[in-house]
Curated annotation (Swiss-Prot):
Biological process (GO), any one: mismatch repair
Keywords: DNA damage, DNA repair, Endonuclease, Hydrolase, Nuclease, Restriction system
Protein name (Swiss-Prot/TrEMBL): Type II nicking enzyme V.HpaIIP
Family: Belongs to the Vsr family.
Gene name in the database record: vsr
Example GO molecular function: endonuclease activity
Enzyme class: hydrolase
EC number(s) from the headed UniProt entry: 3.1.-.-
Matches recorded under CDD domains: Vsr (cd00221)
Function summary: May nick HpaII sequences that contain T/G mispairs resulting from m5C-deamination. If unrepaired, these mismatches can lead to C-to-T transition mutations. The very short patch (VSP) repair process counteracts the mutagenic process by repairing the mismatches in favor of the G-containing strand. This enzyme is an endonuclease that nicks double-stranded DNA within the sequence CTGG next to the thymidine residue that is mismatched to 2'-deoxyguanosine. The incision is mismatch-dependent and strand-specific.
Domain of life (superkingdom): Bacteria
Pfam families listed in its UniProt record: DUF559 (PF04480), Vsr (PF03852)
């Protein structure tokens, strides 16, 4: 049983959800910065609010958490133990939203990068160089 009233819990959750960036986001941002690349974080003027973006080059970067965005979903959805219907619906909604965001941005000339958070943690240099290459290709076309 929760010691806080629903209103108090809502206030606490809202206060703690200020987006400061996840570890994978911060790590990739650090590598991009070291390459001399200047990005925007969570730019709400771009549909889907990418984690990092280069508006000038129309490049949007999303670093997705494996659970929240349904990595290996066909297998992992059966691992959920409690409140199964809620979580399956929630994650599938997130996956559908990700697809809509991708489709919209691509149809408007954007290059989309979607990386899994754990992959970024393992090899941030690889992903930062991939982004750098895409920016270069956008510059010379």
């Amino acid at each position: 049983m929760d010691k806080l009233t629903p209103e108090q819990r809502k206030k606490c959750m809202k206060a703690s959800s200020k987006n400061k960036g996840t570890k994978p986001e911060l790590l990739l941002a650090k590598y991009l910065w070291a390459l001399g690349l200047r990005y925007r974080k969570n730019d709400r003027s771009i549909f889907g609010t990418p984690d990092l973006s280069f508006k000038r080059y129309k490049i949007a970067i999303f670093i997705d958490g494996e659970f929240w965005h349904g990595k290996d979903w066909d297998i992992r959805k059966y691992d959920i133990k409690s409140n199964k219907d809620f979580w399956i619906s929630k994650i599938e909604h997130n996956m559908n939203r990700d697809k809509k965001v991708n489709d919209y941005l691509i149809s408007n000339g954007w290059v989309i990068f979607r990386f899994w958070g754990k992959d970024v943690l393992k090899n941030p240099e690889k992903f930062s160089l991939e982004i750098q290459k895409a920016i270069y290709e956008r510059c010379v076309r």
